[in-house]
Amino acid sequence: MSASVKESLQLQLLEMEMLFSMFPNQGEVKLEDVNALTNIKRYLEGTREALPPKIEFVITLQIEEPKVKIDLQVTMPHSYPYVALQLFGRSSELDRHQQLLLNKGLTSYIGTFDPGELCVCAAIQWLQDNSASYFLNRKLVYEPSTQAKPVKNTFLRMWIYSHHIYQQDLRKKILDVGKRLDVTGFCMTGKPGIICVEGFKEHCEEFWHTIRYPNWKHISCKHAESVETEGNGEDLRLFHSFEELLLEAHGDYGLRNDYHMNLGQFLEFLKKHKSEHVFQILFGIESKSSDS
C-alpha cells in the first residue's frame, strides 16, 4: 500500500511541476498549504514518517471569449491518479445552475480517463475549450421570452448522523466542502456528530459523497427532505451559511475525546431553525420544551 501511495505522490509532484511551468506568474496557482509540496518531498525522501496532507490548490484561469475568470479548485487524494481527482470550477459570472452544469460536464470528461493518467492539465484545457457555452447559456436563460418555461430544480435537505466528529482535518474537510459547493447548514462536532446540508440536490449529493470518501464508516443519512422549486431555492433555506456548531459538552475530560454534546442546547438550536421535528428522527426520543 505504501509503495503505491509513494508512486502516486511522485506523479503528483511531476504534475505540479508541469502546472507551475504553465502558470509561472505569482498567484496563478494558490496552494492551500504552502508547505504541501515540501512535506511530500520529505516523505518520499524518508525524512518525514507521517503521511503528508493532500495537495489542495486553486488555479485561476483566464477565458478569452467571453472575457471571464474561472477558479478551478483541485484536491489530489493520496492515491491520485489511481483514484478520482476532486475538481470544482467556480466563476462569479455563473449562477448556481450554470455552475452545476459546468461541473457536471467537467466531471463527465475527467471520468473518461483511465486510472494512472494525470488529468489536471487536461481539465484546464477542457475548461478553456468548452466553458464559453455555459456563460452563453446563462445569458439566454435571463433573456425575456414568453415561450420560456421555468426550470425546475430539486431542493434537498439532508440530516446526517455520525457516532462522533472530533478530528481537526475531518472538520476542516467538511467545512471546506460545504463552502465549495455553496450549500448551507451546519456541522455539530463532538459525540454524536450531526451534519445538516441543504441546497440543490446535486450539490447535496456531491457533499454526501465527498465527505464519506474514502472510508468514513460510522455515518448515515437519517432523514432527507426534498421539494421541487422553480426558483433558486433561497426561500427554502433554514440556514444562511455552512458553519461549525460548537455546543457545551457533558463529561469533557480534557484531552479525552469521550464526551457527549448537550442535546438540550441542540434542541433549542433546532427550534430556532424550525427543525424540532428532526430531533426524534436523529435520536429516537421525543423533544420536550425547556420551559415545561
From Swiss-Prot:
Superkingdom: Eukaryota
Leader sequence segment: none
Span of domain RWD: 14-134
Disulfide bond residue pairs: none
The organism's taxonomic lineage, starting at the top: Eukaryota, Metazoa, Chordata, Craniata, Vertebrata
Annotated InterPro entries: Phi-like, Prp3_C, RWD_dom, UBQ-conjugating_enzyme/RWD
Pfam families membership: Prp3_C (PF06544), RWD (PF05773)
Protein name: RWD domain-containing protein 2A
Species: Homo sapiens
Transmembrane segments: none
